[in-house]
Every structure is written in structure tokens, then in C-alpha cells.
């Protein structure tokens, strides 16, 4: 309707999305239709800003009905933030990130950014540097905001795997630095969907061998059966690279590699130990 008769929508926004007491069911019905089936465009945001705020702050949605609506509301705001409709000092970000109780919105917001930037079809679409800077600034703002109670946000922090997977934040090693910081945080003890990280970890291996090794070794030793690398050779390729190269600026990397191999073998089940020994012992400095 905004596309067909925009003047009518502008004039009737408050009637379409009423926020007065007693009209909650009307708002729920119209917001449900808009946020799930409507289109987001920059021209809409100015007149819908307070409606987004109401949808976030009002106790409108029950657990079953509301999860998808809450997710899509947060995703809509992530879209508008990326295009510069509002900034880090906006009250809207506070409504999402000021409390760990908004985990549904937080996960959806952070996940949507990484997923939407992923060039999964290989079309080579370029993303404006201004957009990328807005997102890196957002992440750094979020990390600073939760630094004293970050364990309350583990499910949100794990969504950085999408940001790393999308491959848009490589300049200056920003993405690998952020991922390394998360994975190496022993208070968080994060596990991640390793298959999302594999391709970019291999791309980063030559330039950032220590950080890639740290990430892979921590995730392998920390992960459970469902959370290992789907490409079995990523561990082998990393170990082989370290064994076959010298690292004068990191003289402990080779010995750390050997320690990792030994720990990995120690953690192996009896039925898989022989196979793993054949795979990995050849990468020890003294096999």
C-alpha cells in the first residue's frame, strides 16, 4: 500500500498502527502483516520509528506467536541501521541491547547483518564501505557495552560466526581479530558452527597462522561431536602448514601445534584413535 498510495499511508500511519491503550490487538494484527510481508524501504522509517519502538518495548507478543515477529522487527531495524537511518546513539539500539532479556531480538539483529552481507550466490555484489564501517562500529560498541557481563550474551556473541563467514570484514584483519578474541575468551567458552568458518580460516591461514591455529585448536578441543569441522582436512592443512614453515616471530607455534595434536589424541574415543593417529602424528615435529 505504501508503494501504491504513499500519501494515504503517510496520513494514516497512526490509524494503521495505533499505539493507544485498548488498541493493542489492532496494532498486533497490522504490525504482523507489515513486518512479515511488507517491504522495508528508507522512506518508511521516519514515520515508523515510534512504531518500531512500540513493537520492541510493549509487552505484546506471547512466546509462540511472537518469536517470529520479534525477530523480523529486529531484522528490520538492522536493515535501517545499515543504511544509516539511525546511529549508535539512537534509543532504538538501547531497546534491543540494554537488557539480556531481549535475546531473541539481539540474536536476530546480529545474525541478520552477517547473513545479509554473505554473497552466497557468488554474484560479487559490492557493499559500500560506509555500510561496513557502521556495522564494525556497532559490533565494537556492543562488545564494550557488555564487557562486564558478557557471559549473559553468549548466544548473541556466537552469531559473529555469520559476520566472519560473509567475508566482508577482512580489511586490516578486523574479522579474524574479533573472532580470535571471542574464541580465546576462557570465560565465554564459546562453541561455533565450524563449517561456517572453514573457508575463510583457510584463506587467513598464511597471513594469520597463529590466530587461525588458536581458533581451530580451541574449537576442536572444546567442541562436541556435532560441532566439529565438516571439512576434515582443515585441521590437517593447518598442521601441515605450521610443520612446513618457519615462524621466527612466533617460536612457540610449532610446539603449541604438537601439544594440540597430543591433546586431540588423548580426547579421542578408543574406536577412532588409530585412525586419528595415522592422520595427525605425521605433523609432529618428532613423530
Where in the sequence are the language-model features?
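Non-catalytic all-alpha helical scaffold/repeat segments
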Residues: 1-287
Amino acid at each position: 500500500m505504501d508503494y501504491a498510495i504513499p500519501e494515504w499511508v503517510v496520513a494514516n500511519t497512526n490509524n494503521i498502527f495505533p499505539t493507544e491503550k485498548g488498541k493493542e490487538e489492532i496494532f498486533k494484527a497490522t504490525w504482523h502483516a507489515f513486518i512479515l510481508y511488507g517491504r522495508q524501504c528508507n522512506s518508511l522509517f521516519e514515520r515508523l520509528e515510534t512504531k518500531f519502538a512500540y513493537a520492541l518495548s510493549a509487552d505484546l507478543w506471547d512466546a509462540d506467536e511472537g518469536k517470529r515477529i520479534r525477530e523480523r522487527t529486529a531484522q528490520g531495524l538492522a536493515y535501517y541501521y545499515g543504511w544509516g537511518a539511525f546511529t549508535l546513539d539512537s534509543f532504538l539500539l538501547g531497546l534491543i541491547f540494554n537488557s539480556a532479556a531481549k535475546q531473541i531480538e539481539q540474536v536476530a539483529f546480529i545474525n541478520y547483518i552477517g547473513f545479509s552481507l554473505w554473497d552466497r550466490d557468488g554474484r560479487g555484489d559490492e557493499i559500500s564501505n560506509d555500510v561496513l564501517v557502521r556495522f564494525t562500529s556497532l559490533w565494537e560498541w556492543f562488545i564494550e557495552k557488555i564487557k562486564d557481563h558478557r557471559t549473559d550474551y553468549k548466544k548473541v556473541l556466537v552469531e559473529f560466526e555469520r559476520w566472519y563467514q560473509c567475508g566482508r570484514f577482512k580489511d586490516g584483519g578486523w574479522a579474524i581479530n574479533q573472532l580470535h578474541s571471542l574464541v580465546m575468551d576462557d570465560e565465554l567458552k564459546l562453541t561455533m558452527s565450524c563449517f561456517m568458518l572453514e573457508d575463510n580460516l583457510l584463506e587467513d591461514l598464511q597471513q594469520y597462522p597463529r590466530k587461525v591455529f588458536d581458533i581451530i585448536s580451541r574449537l576442536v578441543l572444546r567442541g562436541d561431536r556435532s560441532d566439529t569441522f565438516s571439512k576434515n582436512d582443515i585441521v590437517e592443512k593447518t598442521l601441515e602448514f605450521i610443520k612446513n614453515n618457519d615462524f621466527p616471530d612466533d617460536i612457540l607455534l610449532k610446539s603449541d601445534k604438537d601439544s594440540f595434536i597430543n591433546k586431540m589424541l588423548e580426547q579421542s574415543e578408543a574406536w577412532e584413535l588409530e585412525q586419528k593417529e595415522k592422520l595427525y602424528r605425521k605433523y609432529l615435529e618428532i613423530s
